[in-house]
UniProtKB/Swiss-Prot annotation:
Source species taxonomy: Eukaryota, Metazoa, Chordata, Craniata, Vertebrata
PANTHER family (alphabetical): CALCIUM-BINDING PROTEIN 1-RELATED (PTHR45917), CALCIUM-BINDING PROTEIN 5 (PTHR45917:SF3)
Gene Ontology CC annotations of this record: cytoplasm; cytosol
A Pfam family the protein falls into: EF-hand_7
Name of this protein: Calcium-binding protein 5
Tissue specificity comment: Expressed in the retina (at protein level).
Matching Gene3D superfamilies: EF-hand (1.10.238.10)
Organism: Bos taurus
Top-level lineage group: Eukaryota
Binding-site list for Ca(2+) 1: 41, 43, 45, 52
Residues engaged in binding Ca(2+) 2: 118, 120, 122, 124, 129
Function as written in the Swiss-Prot or TrEMBL entry: Inhibits calcium-dependent inactivation of L-type calcium channel and shifts voltage dependence of activation to more depolarized membrane potentials. Involved in the transmission of light signals. May positively regulate neurotransmitter vesicle endocytosis and exocytosis in a salt-dependent manner. May play a role in the extension and network organization of neurites.
GO molecular function list: calcium channel regulator activity; calcium ion binding
Ranges of residues in domain EF-hand: 28-63, 82-99, 105-140, 142-173
UniProt keyword annotation of Repeat present: yes
Length: 173
């Protein structure tokens, strides 16, 4: 039998990634956008042109296709009078930034995911807690035996539970 850790972890990572896409941008991300925007706002009037937007996106590592730029340009001309201010720029870039970082799981996201599994909040995930969480997340896709094997594999110290450190190691496999 193939070890079920892979599908369970992939599903959990996908769930965390979806939450990442729904979160607001953090102060560091907004500051990164502000610095990039100011670099292209040559006349310091608080606006950049459609053309500058494409170049700005490229300097930030996004490679919009010509079609995407045309669509953005039309949207900007129709809704924003042909120019983009910082707030509009943030609104345009937020989905791209969130999609880019969605696959990256940070410590806080790991803690949040761990708390989802640790139903009683004692700092350890028991077989029962994992079964409940997997049932919620995956439905009937994993059997009790498979879930038990997940705990056994993740339980490095052999105490029958998965602590946060073991959880992080399990998720990074």
């Amino acid at each position: 039998m193939q070890f079920p850790m892979g599908p369970a972890c992939i599903f959990l990572r996908k769930g965390i990634a979806e939450k990442q896409r729904e979160r607001p941008l953090g102060p560091d991300e907004i500051e990164e956008l502000r610095e990039a925007f100011l670099e292209f706002d040559k006349d310091r009037d608080g606006f950049i042109s459609c053309k500058d937007l494409g170049n700005l996106m490229r300097t930030m590592g996004y490679m919009p296709t010509e079609m995407e730029l045309i669509e953005l340009g039309q949207q900007i001309r129709m809704n924003l009078g042909g120019r983009v201010d910082f707030d509009d720029f943030v609104e345009l870039m937020t989905p791209k930034l969130l999609a880019e970082t969605a696959g990256m799981i940070g410590v806080q996201e790991m803690r949040d995911a761990f708390k989802e599994f640790d139903a009683n909040g004692d700092g350890e995930i028991t077989l029962g807690e994992l079964q409940q969480a997997m049932q919620r997340l995956l439905g009937d896709k994993l059997t009790s035996q498979e879930i038990s094997e997940v705990v056994q594999e993740a339980d490095i110290n052999g105490d029958g539970t998965v602590d946060f450190e073991e959880f992080v190691k399990m998720m990074s496999r």
